[in-house]
Amino acid sequence: MAGIAQVTQGGPKTFTPADNEVILGGKLVEARAGGRIGIAAAGSTKVLGVALTDALAPEDFPGANGTDALGRPVISAAPVPTSVAVAYGGAEVKVTYSANAAFGDKLVATAAGTVAPAGATPDARTIVGVCTEPAGVVVATKDVGLMRTA
């Protein structure tokens, strides 16, 4: 191949949520059919990164003078986002932890787009990042902490 065009450099990359998916910033997202994304399931091997914004699928956009799936009023002056910026490839972002994690722990996806420390012998495809919260994360006191994406 004589030359190629670079598609992205460092991200984030924008995706459209899958039908009936409510994407919230700070949650892990995974690849879905048709080039769309959804909230990552526990143990997912298709995690793309961390959502930086909230959004709905375009087909789920509510009618005028209603509320969206996030409970926000919908008026013509405040459209609901239908695309999501996703951080990946070494980005450091805040995520929600489902279990306590120490600084430096390798992390895997857990239910509802959250993260937890990997077990002793995880499938390498399930590692989504590293805990970079300096004091670690203690879920009972604060379940949000820093993670560097894989």
Q: Positions of the model-derived regions?
A:
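Surface-exposed, low-hydrophobicity beta-strand/loop segments enriched in small/polar/acidic residues
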Residues: 1-150
